[in-house]
From Swiss-Prot:
Glycosylated residues, chain numbering: N29, N81, N111
Keyword annotations of the record: Allergen, Disulfide bond, Glycoprotein, Hydrolase, Protease, Signal, Thiol protease, Zymogen
Superkingdom, taxonomy of origin: Eukaryota
Function: Cysteine protease responsible for the cleavage of kiwellin into kissper and KiTH.
Catalytic activity: Specificity close to that of papain
Organism: Actinidia deliciosa (Kiwi)
Propeptide feature ranges: 25-126
Transmembrane regions listed in the UniProt entry: none
GO annotation terms (biological process): proteolysis
SMART domains: Inhibitor_I29, Pept_C1
Official protein name in the record: Actinidain
Length: 380
């Protein structure tokens, strides 16, 4: 026997009312903030980030941008179905063009090395279900590129710092400024953007790289200090590219070392990301270089652990978790152009993450990984 029409109508009315109340509650920040309250928030934000505007009309112009950013944040976070949050950070009163031209410095183009088969998927290959090179001591603290499009240098240096630690056991913070000042090429122009692989090639050609302490970061282009360039503390042997658009190969590579990648970071959601697993929206027009330092799964959602160079005020203390295993180019194009430095030890290649955390379960040869560990198995 069916339910009475009056009962069905009352039920629909009840649930519709609940939905309206829920939306109203979630949108309360949008409707209850007065202009004076938002102004007070902006003044506090200006103090926090050390900003001030003195030219006529500039404060008012920036305040309008801030208000729109706050509206975007409130609308995004009101949706409880989203897997990540956004928030106010140092970019809150920048226009999209200012943000892109200042902070996105990856120059896309053809890579100059052939793709290596070192991390090609192998039938039956099993990878750890979780990797975090931070816990293995192979990741230097978050750095800030400042108002310089030198993300390519930060990504290259982060992977060199990582492989050096994995091979030698010593973690040394290295000099991005040396790459920016001394590593210029036709396509790599310091704070005006560049190739990650040009950074690797400079270190190889130079016979090494200096430390951050000796050649400190200035967030601007400078003349190459030849005396400091000749102080070489860390070397690499070569660099290679992970097979393109292949997240399993990328996962294999990250099992053995941090990996440089580029992605599309131009959208508002990426710019204001604060926590959770980022799922977009974003495209695949890669414009920003970062470093993958691990991967994992939370609540059934696979993710990459990404180290950025926008200070600890962005994201999860400077890091982002971004959706993994979506196929093709990956979320925001993260699997489009991965690359990594190679530094040989007596066994020709570093040990994987699992052997540094637990008893060794892999062995390495110059041709690639051999062996298995607990985790995810690849099948063709």
């Amino acid at each position: 026997m069916g339910l009475p029409k009056s009962f069905v109508s009352m039920s629909l009315l009840f649930f519709s009312t609940l939905l309206i109340l829920s939306l109203a509650f979630n949108a309360k920040n949008l409707t209850q903030r007065t202009n004076d309250e938002v102004k007070a928030m902006y003044e506090s934000w200006l103090i926090k980030y050390g900003k001030s505007y003195n030219s006529l009309g500039e404060w008012e112009r920036r305040f309008e941008i801030f208000k729109e950013t706050l509206r975007f944040i409130d609308e995004h976070n009101a949706d409880t179905n989203r897997s990540y949050k956004v928030g106010l950070n140092q970019f809150a009163d920048l226009t999209d063009e200012e943000f892109r031209s200042t902070y996105l410095g990856f120059t896309s183009g053809s890579n100059k090395t052939k793709v290596s088969n070192r991390y090609e998927p192998r039938v039956g290959q099993v990878l750890p279900s979780y990797v975090d090179w931070r816990s293995a001591g192979a990741v230097v603290d978050i750095k800030s590129q400042g108002e310089c499009g030198g993300c390519w240098a930060f990504s290259a240096i982060a992977t060199v710092e990582g492989i050096n630690k994995i091979v030698t056991g010593v973690l040394i913070s290295l000099s991005e400024q040396e790459l920016i000042d001394c590593g210029r090429t036709q396509n790599t122009r310091g704070c005006n953007g560049g190739y990650i692989t040009d950074g690797f090639q400079f270190i190889i050609n130079n016979g090494g790289i200096n430390t951050e302490e000796n050649y400190p970061y200035t967030a601007q282009d400078g003349e190459c200090n030849l005396d400091l360039q000749n102080e070489k503390y860390v070397t690499i042997d070569t660099y290679e590219n992970v097979p393109y658009n292949n997240e399993w190969a990328l996962q294999t590579a990250v099992t053995y070392q941090p990996v440089s990648v580029a992605l599309d970071a131009a959208g508002d959601a990426f710019k204001h990301y604060s926590s959770g697993i980022f799922t977009g929206p974003c495209g695949t027009a890669i414009d920003h270089a970062v470093t993958i330092v691990g991967y994992g799964t939370e609540g059934g959602i696979d993710y990459w652990i990404v180290k950025n160079s926008w200070d600890t005020t962005w994201g999860e203390e400077g890091y982002m978790r971004i959706l993994r295993n979506v196929g093709g180019a990956g979320t925001c194009g993260i699997a489009t152009m991965p690359s990594y430095p190679v530094k040989y030890n007596n066994q020709n290649h570093p040990k994987p993450y699992s052997s540094l955390i637990n008893p060794p379960a892999f062995s390495m040869s110059k041709d690639g990984p051999v062996g298995v560990d607990d985790g995810q198995r690849y099948s063709a």
